[in-house]
Amino acid sequence: MKQSVSAEQIELKSSLPGSKKVYVDGPREGMKVPMREIEQSETNGVPNPPIRVYDTSGPYTDPAYKVELEKGIPTPRHSWIMGRGDVDAYEGREVKPEDDGVKVASKHTPVFPQMDRKPLRAKQGANVTQMHYARNGIITSEMEYVAIREGVEPEFVRKEIAEGRAILPANINHPEAEPMIIGRNFHVKVNANIGNSAVSSSIAEEVEKMTWATRWGADTIMDLSTGKNIHTTREWIIRNAPVPVGTVPIYQALEKVNGIAEDLTWEVYRDTLIEQAEQGVDYFTIHAGVLLRYIPITAKRTTGIVSRGGSIMAQWCLFHHKENFLYTHFEEICEIMKQYDVSFSLGDGLRPGSIADANDEAQFSELETLGELTKIAWKHDVQVMIEGPGHVPMHLIKENMEKELDICQGAPFYTLGPLTTDIAPGYDHITSAIGAAMIGWFGTAMLCYVTPKEHLGLPNKDDVRTGVITYKIAAHAADLAKGHKTAHQRDDALSKARFEFRWRDQFNLSLDPERAMEYHDETLPAEGAKTAHFCSMCGPKFCSMRISHDIREYAKENDLETTEAIEKGMKEKAEEFKEAGSHLYQ
């Protein structure tokens, strides 16, 4: 009897405190775009309006939704995909034990119950990518959905996709995903990496990490599983993921050849691409820019090649003394991608793994090749984003953004940090968030989170939470710096709540309400402290905001401007001092 993964096995939390799930009706029948609405209390009887924010949590935070992981979540895109009339259902490839990294399927593996689902692909001669539709002047339902989420016009979304400045990752076999967009003229997005390894984690844990990450604000998920049950883990994640899912197909291909890089072949890799496309993976990291001639350049580096995918392909190239088969077969890969609308995330296999290697010849040589490959993908109307570093000191970050925009013709940049120093293992979520905020400001479209476990171990769900929140801070700071028209609204609301001592509103408006409340209550746990005009930092006598309130009240009572009130108050205090005898100590 094969086991299943149930909601009881994982921790699923409802909406964040003070929030509720709301839906905005779209222009098409049945289109409902989710938002999170944060309630606010009154100020002296005057209402404060609720604040609506972008929501990535899917149906899990809707109290009306019954979670049944074995059935998957609703499929809002299915009718849109079928309604375009350019796809066919077909039998698909046979799922084999090797897909899960074993010779014989285990009876203990919790196979997803709906495995009889037939995959979709483009009809003969058709192209089903969002870029293809956009270039033909078609505004899809997905584009309309995204426009509501981003607060822009659908035509703007279409144009950004058509010109390659943004991607809308939306595999036709992942109808569960709520459409989102990645581009520098939209909100900066955050990706969270999850996935098992050969020594750690289970399917249930990875599904839990996915729901956990999206609850805290992850815009996409990458399943980087490298151990057993890769196919099955991915199926459970995709069928229950409300956000796009990315993978690095070379990891699974390597498992199929028993971890021996030189045994990899184009045929094994191609089969893996089709397998994952049929499951519904929305974007593939493909290290097609690691060319044979670039590998010797890395020999003088401090940390060599640190990308797993990059090192696998480098090993294959050196063993066979042949060019990277991902590069030589790139046009064939494009043909597969456009049948399912899988987006490219062109991998930076030669990214710097240390500050000493930042912005070196190997890194930028690969970037030149990624620019070449971008043009080829666009020729097929396949969506592309470019992966970036890595480890880069602050003064070298801007050059990365400028070169990417120039060499890759404005394709969205997707960066891992970058980490701005190498000396803080255990705190690399901080070292990288510094770089992430900067490069997001300069134009990076999506930031790949880093957790405190980076360089040390596989992150657990608490590390995932810390990583996501840290990167939501960086992304939001970048949105503010870029002047995104709605970015400041939440900041303004929280600042107003802080000045008015509306403690619960402060908690609820924050990126992590539970943590904010927890820290406040460590020193002032009483319910009355939630309305007190001070916190434990300054106490009641030294609270600057309480003093500011007193000044304003004094000005109001005496019909004065605030500056006049301060001057008048100082004169009155001086008179009191004189009348008391002008003694310094009473």
UniProtKB/Swiss-Prot annotation:
Keywords (A to Z) from UniProt: 4Fe-4S, Iron, Iron-sulfur, Lyase, Metal-binding, S-adenosyl-L-methionine, Thiamine biosynthesis, Zinc
A GO CC annotation given for this chain: cytosol
GO molecular function, one term: 4 iron, 4 sulfur cluster binding
Residue stretches of biased makeup (Basic and acidic residues): 22-33
Residues binding substrate, per UniProt: N193, M222, Y251, H287, S307, R308, G309, D348, G349, L350, R351, E387, Y414
Region (Disordered): 1-33
Purpose: Catalyzes the synthesis of the hydroxymethylpyrimidine phosphate (HMP-P) moiety of thiamine from aminoimidazole ribotide (AIR) in a radical S-adenosyl-L-methionine (SAM)-dependent reaction.
Family: Belongs to the ThiC family.
Protein name (Swiss-Prot/TrEMBL): Phosphomethylpyrimidine synthase
Originating species: Bacillus cereus (strain G9842)
Encoding gene per record: thiC
